[in-house]
């Protein structure tokens, strides 16, 4: 199995720790585990230019520098694990910025068929409330996934 964990922050706090605990519990020795840390691996915000929708994702200004590698990792993964702390009842801005880059894959545009066969887990941690809304941010931005 190929597992990709996308971490909403560079900090290896509670969300990261829970994500790693899940991986340690389910991954076998021959499974491949990769991690993305935001914003290091994707520091750019979506510009809203819609070139990805009109011309193809390879025309995004951030495609060659960041998105080509991340998209390949997402497409190759069997399991996606999203980890995020809660910031004012929502996911981190950088997680939202990453997911905004995949708007071209929404159902109304060009859904990626391979996403329908993937499993995804969203992990959010908070000192109080807001975990449900943070997970909803990720779920609603999810690339063709109705149930995350």
Stretch-by-stretch model annotation:
Residues 1-111:
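N-terminal beta1-alpha1-beta2 submodule of the flavodoxin-like/Rossmannoid cofactor-binding fold
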Residues 16-20, 131-136:
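Short, surface-exposed alpha-helical segments at coil->helix boundaries
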Residues 111-117:
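Short, conserved loop/helix-junction motifs that constitute active-site signature segments
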Residues 119-121:
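Proline-centered loop/turn at the N-terminus of a beta-strand
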Residues 125-129:
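Short acidic/polar capping segments at secondary-structure boundaries
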Residues 146-148:
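Conserved small/polar residues in nucleotide/adenosyl-binding loops
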């Amino acid at each position: 199995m190929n597992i990709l964990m996308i971490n909403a922050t560079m900090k290896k706090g509670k969300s990261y720790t829970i994500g790693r605990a899940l991986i340690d519990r389910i991954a076998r020795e021959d499974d491949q585990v990769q991690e993305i840390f935001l914003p290091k691996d994707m520091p750019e915000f979506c510009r809203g230019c819609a070139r990805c929708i009109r011309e193809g994702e390879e025309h995004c200004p951030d495609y060659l520098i960041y998105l080509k590698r991340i998209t390949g990792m997402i497409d190759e993964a069997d399991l996606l694990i999203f980890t995020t702390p809660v910031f004012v009842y929502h996911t981190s801005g950088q997680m939202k910025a990453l997911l905004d880059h995949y708007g071209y894959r929404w159902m109304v545009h060009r859904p990626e068929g391979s996403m329908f066969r993937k499993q995804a887990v969203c992990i959010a941690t908070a000192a109080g409330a807001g975990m449900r809304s943070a997970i909803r941010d990720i779920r609603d931005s999810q690339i063709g996934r109705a149930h995350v």
